[in-house]
């Protein structure tokens, strides 16, 4: 036979590969930290240089003027509102007075007929009734009766004063508390998703020394010192590993030689196994306990190698009081059944033992992995048991009681004594198992629930006792959130327990389910705190077409039926008496006005999308000449659509469009609300438009931008007032450069309509000689640009009409104007091949400039930008149209 070649890998190569990954991670972290610190330093430098706050003084005054106008408008609105409220209050008061007067007149009219005795006036003897009191005495009496208000009698010197520093300190404490709350919420979310057990519950990432529970070993009784010798072997092995010595030398120091130690072990094994022989005949089939003895004898023969007995691990959880749950004795009537069940159980335990090792590698780590890590690491792995083994060992515990229970229990107890590492309590092993399961995480609890479900099968007294042991101690058991499957399993166990008559178990399981539900209710609000703090925005959803027209999206008239999605669409009758009555199911509900409105609102994109959807679904169903494409569309149109599906799809599309537009505007370089907007480059602010300078190095001295305040994409979609103000800025710029004996060119490039770029109208000054030759250069470049065979006219003359009247809305274009004269326009056929720097490239060629100036632009420092803006502001001051407007 050919030997199969196995590829081995040395430990040094594995360690080297790990070291490389560690170094790579460290390098990535170092680079990220370096970049972050660099950004922080840059922001700090900007803050120190006032890059974010510095503006031209004229611009600052203009912004303050805008804010004052805005505040005055708000005040006027408030005054109007307050006046309305006052008028309403006056009306209410008048009504109330009228009602009171009417009530008083009614009461006086009714009380005229009644007689009332007057109270006798107590007048002193000195004073006569006919004498009139002096005014002074009346004033004195009034002064004695009137009391001052409480705030007038307060000693203001005793009032505690509040300083600005104390207010700042209080605000800082409140902010600190809010930060701590947010950190706690974030930490709780991270802890829920944490897979490493050593990071959970505030861990350090490394196993703590206290997490290893001290495990006391059960003493073997009447085993001839076998357990003691095994423990001694284990300790000698550990000593040899710690001191890096030979195992045989340590054995020779303690026992004289290895042969003496092996002879003692053999004698102890003989004494231990001699008592297990029950005088059974050789021809009889071996029972479960016999097979356990054989497996143990074969496992202990090679104790020098210190290997654990994997065959005996399924007996570690056997209860010491197994007299209640017995294997059948030597009765011939009951022997065959017990032998078959024991065989099944032993095979099942072996399978679970072998699968448990593999399964543990692919399970999500839980809290109980902390203990299993140390148990697998040391030689004490035999003392640890997995929940699967514990579950398997419980199969033999829950059995019917037999007559010869004592004989079978003796064999089970002897097999338990042979285990070298056991839990401390021999009397209540199930109780210890439930305690460990409660101590650990959800994995142990799920296994406990499985054990409870197994316990519900056979009724009996011993069954109820063990069930109380496994379920006992709900106080010590920490509740956790159950998922849907676990709740279903728990409900099935409750029903099963009620059917078997075990009401105590059913009540306990119900209480457990109730506690889990309560725990879930208390935990869910804490998780939603972060969502509640988020600001909700109320937005009018709009739909925009290519031409820039916008209209609000109508809310669904009928709620979307989710169940109807799964049903087949119903066919609507389209013909009556062999005549076509309708094409679509909603033809009866739509008037001619509605149809015209839908046709105007609908875009070519929607029609193409609908066409592609229908064609892709039914292209395979065409039957050559019998079932053509037209028939397919006609039959599809006759099917009734689901309720509200069309409106819901439009709403979803509008929400996605709004979100993408908001994200683009947040990063826009020319929007006032953007965080990246360079305020120090603004020169003048109008009503709808502002004038600014480029953030990169200018092509020529005086290079500037005319930009609308609102986020518009192109000149073809602008309103009339915005376009008029742009033309006013254009005229003043032309006049300014004419006085300096310069000519100027205005450029606009509208590309990438889906990306929602901000419209920029560039003004580039040129010398007079170059400016006179510019129309020839641009005309030739436009004729040679783009596709050879174009769908639209290549060169559009703008001398008689401006760009808004020459190019339809929604088309990408390039436009150039020469001073106050007209210019040329070109509709872009292929946006991917047409360069965005087309106009600047032509000017760069005319002036013989470096390509890097007009390709991406060279960055400028803040000082250079400030000098540039101050110089341009001096040029612009005599021609500023914003000041003339404001004055």
From Swiss-Prot:
Residues 73-98 have a biased composition (Basic residues). Pfam families: CwfJ_C_1, CwfJ_C_2. Residues 11-103, 164-254, 495-524 form a coiled coil. It comes from the Eukaryota. Residues 433-442 have a biased composition (Polar residues). Keywords: Coiled coil, Isopeptide bond, Phosphoprotein, Ubl conjugation. Gene3D superfamilies: HIT-like. Residues 99-110 have a biased composition (Low complexity). InterPro entries: Cwf19-like (IPR040194), Cwf19-like_C_dom-1 (IPR006768), Cwf19-like_C_dom-2 (IPR006767), HIT-like_sf (IPR036265). There is a cross-link at residues 168, 597 (Glycyl lysine isopeptide (Lys-Gly) (interchain with G-Cter in SUMO2)). Residues 14-72, 124-143, 342-352, 414-430 have a biased composition (Basic and acidic residues). Residues 1-143, 315-370, 405-447 are annotated as: Disordered. The modification Phosphoserine is found at residues 71, 354, 366, 478, 622. Belongs to the CWF19 family. This is CWF19-like protein 2. It comes from Mus musculus.
């Amino acid at each position: 036979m050919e030997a199969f070649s196995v590829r081995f890998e040395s430990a040094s190569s594995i360690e080297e590969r790990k070291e490389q990954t560690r170094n790579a991670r460290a390098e990535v972290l170092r680079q990220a930290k370096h970049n972050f610190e660099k950004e922080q330093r840059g922001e700090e430098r900007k803050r120190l240089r006032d890059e974010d706050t510095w503006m031209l003084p004229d611009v600052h005054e203009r912004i303050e003027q805008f804010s004052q106008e805005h505040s005055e408008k708000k005040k006027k609105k408030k005054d109007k509102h307050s006046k309305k409220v006052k008028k309403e209050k006056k009306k209410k008061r008048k009504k109330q007075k009228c009602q009171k007067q009417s009530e008083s007149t009614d009461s006086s009219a009714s009380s005229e007929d009644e007689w009332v005795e007057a109270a006798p006036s107590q007048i002193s003897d000195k004073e006569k009734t006919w004498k009139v009191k002096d005014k002074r005495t009346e004033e004195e009496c009034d002064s004695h009766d009137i009391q001052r208000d409480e705030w007038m009698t307060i000693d203001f010197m005793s009032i505690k004063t509040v300083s600005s520093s104390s207010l700042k300190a209080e605000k800082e404490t409140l902010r600190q508390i809010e930060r701590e709350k947010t950190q706690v919420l974030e930490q709780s979310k991270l802890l829920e998703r944490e897979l490493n057990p050593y990071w959970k519950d505030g861990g350090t990432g490394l196993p703590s020394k206290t997490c290893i529970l001290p495990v006391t070993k059960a003493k073997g009784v009447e085993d001839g010192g076998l357990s003691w010798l095994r423990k001694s072997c284990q300790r000698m092995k550990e000593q040899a590993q710690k001191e890096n010595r030979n195992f045989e030398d340590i054995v020779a120091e303690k026992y004289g030689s290895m042969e003496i130690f092996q002879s003692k072990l053999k004698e102890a094994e003989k004494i231990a196994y001699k008592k297990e022989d029950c005088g059974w005949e050789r021809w009889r089939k071996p029972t479960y306990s016999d097979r356990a003895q054989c497996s143990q004898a074969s496992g202990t023969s090679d104790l020098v190698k210190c290997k654990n007995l994997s065959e005996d691990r399924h007996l570690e959880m056997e209860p010491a009081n197994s007299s209640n749950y017995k294997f059948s004795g030597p009765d011939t009537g009951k022997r065959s059944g017990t032998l078959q069940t024991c065989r099944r159980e032993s095979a099942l335990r072996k399978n679970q033992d072998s699968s448990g090792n593999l399964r543990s590698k692919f399970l999500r780590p839980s809290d109980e992995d902390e203990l299993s890590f140390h148990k697998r690491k040391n030689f004490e792995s035999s003392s640890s048991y997995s929940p699967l083994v514990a579950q398997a060992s419980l199969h033999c515990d829950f059995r019917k009681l037999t007559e010869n229970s004592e004989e079978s229990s003796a064999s089970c107890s002897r097999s338990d004594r042979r285990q070298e590492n056991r839990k401390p309590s021999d009397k209540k092993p199930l109780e210890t198992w439930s305690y460990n399961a409660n101590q650990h995480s959800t994995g142990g609890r799920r296994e406990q629930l499985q054990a409870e479900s197994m316990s519900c099968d056979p009724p009996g007294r011993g069954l109820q006792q063990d069930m109380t042991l496994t379920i006992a101690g709900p106080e010590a058991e920490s509740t956790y959130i159950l998922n849907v499957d676990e709740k279903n399993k728990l409900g099935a166990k409750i029903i099963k327990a009620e059917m078997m008559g075990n009401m105590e178990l059913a009540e306990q399981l119900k209480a457990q389910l109730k506690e889990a539900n309560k725990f879930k209710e208390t935990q869910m609000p804490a998780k939603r705190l972060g969502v509640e703090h988020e600001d909700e925005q109320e937005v009018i959803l709009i739909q925009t077409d290519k031409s820039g027209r916008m209209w609000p999206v109508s809310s669904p008239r009928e709620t979307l039926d989710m169940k109807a999605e799964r049903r087949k669409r119903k066919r609507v009758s389209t013909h009556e008496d062999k005549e076509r009555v309708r094409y679509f199911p909603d033809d009866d509900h739509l008037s001619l006005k509605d149809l015209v409105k839908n046709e105007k609102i609908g875009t070519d994109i929607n029609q193409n999308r609908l066409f592609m959807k229908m064609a892709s679904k039914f292209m395979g169903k065409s039957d050559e000449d019998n079932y053509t494409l037209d028939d397919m569309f006609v039959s599809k149109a006759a099917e009734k659509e689901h309720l509200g599906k069309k409106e819901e799809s439009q709403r979803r599309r509008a929400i996605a469009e709004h979100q993408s537009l908001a994200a683009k505007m947040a990063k826009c370089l020319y929007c006032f609300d953007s965080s990246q907007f360079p305020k120090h480059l603004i020169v003048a602010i109008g009503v709808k438009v502002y004038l600014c300078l480029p953030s990169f190095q200018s092509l020529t001295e005086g290079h500037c931008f005319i930009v609308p305040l609102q986020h518009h994409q192109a000149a073809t979609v602008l309103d009339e007032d915005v376009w008029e103000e742009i033309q006013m800025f254009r005229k003043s710029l032309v006049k300014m450069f004419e006085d300096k004996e310069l000519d100027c060119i205005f450029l606009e490039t509208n590309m990438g309509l889906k990306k929602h770029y901000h419209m920029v109208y560039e003004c580039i000054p040129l010398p007079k000689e170059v400016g006179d030759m510019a129309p020839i250069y641009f005309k030739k470049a436009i004729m040679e640009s783009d596709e050879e065979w174009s769908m639209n006219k290549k060169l559009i003359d703008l001398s008689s009409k401006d760009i808004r009247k020459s190019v339809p809305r929604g088309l990408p274009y390039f436009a150039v104007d020469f001073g106050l004269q007209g210019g040329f326009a070109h509709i872009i056929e292929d946006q991917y091949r047409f360069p965005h720097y087309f106009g600047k490239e032509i000017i760069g060629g005319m002036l013989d400039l470096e390509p890097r100036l007009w390709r991406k632009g060279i960055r400028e420092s803040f000082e250079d930008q400030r000098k540039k803006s101050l110089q341009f502001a001096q040029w612009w001051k005599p021609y500023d149209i914003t000041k003339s407007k404001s004055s």
